[in-house]
Amino acid sequence: MKNILHITLILFFSLTIFSCAKKSSDISISKISVQESSEVSSSTIKEIEGTWVTNCNTASWNKIHYVIETITVSGSAFLWKWDEYFDSSCSDVYMIWTNNYSSLSLTNEVTFDGGSKGSQFTMNVDSQEGLMKTEAAVKDYNNWNWCGFSDWVLNTAKDYSGIKCGNNESYPAINATVNGVYKLDESSLLITKDSTTSVGSTVFIKQ
């Protein structure tokens, strides 16, 4: 679903070029420079525990598709999921991307431009999987030979951790360390795992 890492794929029937960001991050990055940082207590991680979900948004990696992102934090376990859809109401699922991480810990508190606070974090990759939910997705990804796979089938996940895919985009290997940053504003969460000095513009709402 994931990124969350951008890949370029050629959509054979429409010649649409897009990058598969979810597995690294489907997030539109809003550049915010860090002015200062300090150590942060690991107990602060409790403030983001639970499930966070986005609205139905246009997928950044494929402008004719839509996505709902879900983040679930439980202790040091972190799940990031991207449900990809054909339609703007996000009712016709195309495929699901799921990244699982472990050993989540906070490293530094940061102050962004404007004075808002955030926290940098680190975690380890457990898995990064794609799950085809439609025959169209199976056909598309087999035709693309994405990540070297040409044997996708319905409802059978494939893990692409540590593989170079698309436009020479490499995905972190299992057990690799991923670093990111988040900013919490009451029940809204801005987060990215592709930078430690800027947060995404995609808003996650606490469920």
Q: Where in this protein do the model-derived segments appear?
A:
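Bacterial Sec-dependent N-terminal signal peptides
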Residues: 16-47
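Sec-dependent bacterial lipoprotein signal peptides
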Residues: 1-18
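Non-cytosolic coordination micro-motifs
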Residues: 190
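Short N-terminal edge-element motif at the start of the domain
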Residues: 35-89
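Contiguous, well-ordered beta-strand patches that form the walls/edges
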Residues: 55-64, 79-186, 195-200, 205-207
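N-terminal cationic leader/targeting segments used for protein routing and processing
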Residues: 3-4, 32, 180, 184
